[in-house]
Amino acid sequence: MSDSYLSFVNSSWGRRLAQTIGLPQPLPLQRHRSGQQGLANPVIIAGAGRLADEVRRIFKATDTVPAQAATLKAPSTVKVQGAVFDASAVIDLKQLDELYEFFHANARRLGQHARVVVLGTAPEHCQDLPQAIAQRALEGLVRSLAKELRRAITVQLIYVAPGAEQALESSLRFFLSRRSAYVSGQVVRLEKSVDGAPSIDWDKPFSGRRALVTGASRGIGLAIAQVLARDGAQVVCVDVPQALSSLEQAASSVGGHAWALDITAADAVQQLQAYVAEHGAFDVVVHNAGITRDKTIAKMSEAAWRSVLAVNLQAPLQLSDALLQGQGLNAGGRIVCVSSISGIAGNLGQSNYATSKAGVIGLVQGLAPVAAARQVTVNAVAPGFIETQMTAKIPLMIREAGRRMNSLSQGGQPIDVAETIAWLAHPASGGVSGQVVRVCGQSLLGA
């Protein structure tokens, strides 16, 4: 669905009116397109932590141009499209001043749609209390910058565990690219990869890999299938038998296979096991299928409660368990679930949905350590307001509020969720597990 306000304030007349009366002026986000340069350019590298050499290696591999950082003594107005600050060596409160000085001197140099990444050491990996406090303080800085910089600029914090330096590349590539246009203010933890350092074709990272996507006949599920196929995957598109016609169209559009399966059926696990026995194991499984049955809990029927939990939570749990126990996932496999901002913040009239999506977060956090023994990662995305057929049915004023209540002042697109899932499912993302990444433009809900 089109965003009329976004189009209006970016027209010549609308821009003048918005400036005159002080209306928000969000910029249309620049998203990745095939054939475009992968990373922002040029990018400032600053900080002197243990990750600086790895960042420079990644920049060299991606032809990213490093730019000179401005300082308080040597200011500069030359525009840049990104900044990476390695704060992994910050060990006390005094050293936090280095971040103030850097961002104070360089914030105005960041161009529209720029990407900012701060690298740190997670507090649980710090050597003492002063270091742990200083590293935890980075979260407040990053979330504040994400709200202050505006102009479609995004800001993230990546905590990299000691020894996990080689796990950084896929995450840094993602957060410095247009693929992460609607992800901002996020904190991601990297540990040592569960499956080593595989050889990667960065143009077609899923080449030779098989992916299963549920709820794939339309909307976000279709976008996920399209992005995975674009990046080389053979995609099995799953949806309920009632959606067979649109499912077959979706599968055909990505050169994949349509499989009509009710994931809540009593024999769904047996059907999955039979499919794997006939066709082979998967490398990527995306639990996207979900439903809503909105009512306040006082008015909600038992059937509405149970059906939402069955589709959104029970089915992903049962299918994931069957895949892990029954050799349905290859080593180096990826499970990605779809949670929601509602699962983090709750929502009026969605107690069933919020319960199910909070449960998905519990599934990810609980299953990740178990899956690691099989060299499999488990993660989730938590979308905010995404422009879909479902959100198009929301009453106008509520829909507009949902669009504007984030730092980017607009709704996301299904491809924003799909690109984030593709990063989590990436063969080089073995160091990312047990994480829940919001795709919400830094929504005020649950902040």
What residue ranges belong to the model's regions?
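Substrate-binding pocket helix/loop in short-chain dehydrogenase/reductase
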Residues: 95, 296-297, 304-305, 402
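Residue(s) in the substrate-gating loop at a strand-loop-helix junction
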Residues: 340
